[in-house]
Design a protein with these regions (language model features):
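Residues forming the flavin
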Residues: 1-274
Length: 274
C-alpha cells in the first residue's frame, strides 16, 4: 500500500549514491533519491547478430521470445514451416506451441552435444510431437530473398566447426533462435556494480546485495534461472534485505566477507560471497 508505480518509465542512469535518473511521458525527466535499490531488469535474448549466422537477411528470422509474444499476445503466427536453432526452454516450449497452432516444426538444432533445456521440456515438447533434435549441429546458411526459403544445417566437430558434406537443407519460411539469454546489466555497469564475468550479472552477497551498499539484485539480472520459482525466492530475499537495510540493518564491511570458490565440476556459484 502507498507504493508509487511508474509505468512506461525508462531509467537512464543510477549513480553510486543511489540517485536514479529516469524519463516518462507524464513526468518528463525526473530524479529519485533512493534509500535502497533492487535491480530486477531481467535478461534479453541473443539475436542473429550476436551469434553471426551467415546468409542473406530475409524476413522470418525471430528470437523464440519474439515468436512467443506473436502467438500468445498478438494472436498471429510467425510462420508455417519452422526450424528452431538452440534447445533452450523457450525454444522447446515454442516448438510445442507452434505445432499445436498448426505449424510444422521441422527440426530443433543444437550446437552442443547436449540440450540446453530441461529434460521434461525435451520429452513433452519435442519427443511427444515427433520433432527431431539434432545435437552437435548448427545453422550454416540462411537462404531467401524477401522471406526465408531455406535453412542449411550442418554437423559440427569437437571444435564446433561445420563438418563438410554433412549439410541438410530444410525448406522453411521461419527460423527461430533460442540461443541463450544475457542478463540486462547496462545500468548496473553504469552504476559501478561489480559484475561476475562468468554469469554476466552482479556479484552478490547471500542477502543479494551487490558491491554497492544499498543496491540489491535478484532474478535473471543476476544469472539466468531455469525456473521462475527460484526467481521468486531470490526476489523475496532481496526485498527483505532492502527493507532491513533501510531500517539500519546493513551487512558488515569487507572484513566479514567470505568468498565462495567454485570447485571441480562447478561452473559458478550464486551468491559469490557470504
Amino acid at each position: 500500500q502507498g507504493i508509487d508505480i511508474k509505468t512506461d518509465t525508462m531509467v537512464l542512469d543510477i549513480s553510486d549514491s543511489r540517485l536514479i535518473q529516469a524519463v516518462n511521458p507524464t513526468d518528463g525527466y525526473l530524479s529519485i533519491q533512493a534509500g535502497a535499490i533492487v535491480l530486477a531488469m531481467g535478461c534479453r535474448e541473443r539475436t542473429r547478430g550476436a551469434i553471426g549466422i551467415p546468409g542473406t537477411r530475409p524476413a522470418g528470422v525471430y528470437t523464440a521470445g519474439c515468436a512467443q509474444r506473436f502467438v500468445n499476445i498478438e494472436g498471429c503466427m510467425p510462420g508455417r514451416r519452422v526450424v528452431i536453432l538452440g534447445s533452450g526452454d523457450i525454444g522447446l516450449i515454442m516448438a510445442r506451441r507452434l505445432t499445436l497452432e498448426g505449424a510444422k516444426v521441422l527440426a530443433c538444432v543444437e550446437l552442443q552435444p547436449y540440450s540446453g533445456g530441461l529434460q521434461r521440456n525435451i520429452t513433452q515438447c519435442l519427443e511427444d510431437f515427433g520433432i527431431p533434435l539434432y545435437l552437435s549441429h548448427t545453422v550454416t546458411d540462411i537462404r531467401g530473398d524477401k522471406r526465408v526459403e531455406q535453412v542449411v544445417v550442418s554437423a559440427v566437430d569437437d571444435s564446433r566447426r561445420p563438418v563438410p558434406g554433412s549439410e541438410m537443407v530444410f525448406d522453411c519460411d521461419t527460423l527461430l533462435l533460442s540461443v541463450g539469454l544475457i542478463p540486462e546489466n547496462e545500468l548496473s555497469r553504469q552504476a559501478g556494480v561489480e559484475l561476475d564475468p562468468r554469469t554476466n550479472g552482479p556479484r552478490v552477497y547471500e542477502n543479494m546485495e551487490t558491491s554497492l551498499s544499498g543496491v540489491f539484485a535478484c532474478g535473471n539480472v543476476v544469472h539466468v534461472h531455469d525456473l521462475v520459482d527460484f526467481v521468486t525466492m531470490e526476489s523475496t530475499r532481496a526485498g527483505e534485505a532492502a527493507a532491513a537495510y533501510l531500517q539500519g540493518d546493513a551487512r558488515g564491511g569487507p572484513a566479514l566477507e567470505v568468498p565462495i570458490r567454485a570447485g571441480e565440476g562447478v561452473t559458478y556459484t550464486v551468491p559469490q560471497v557470504i
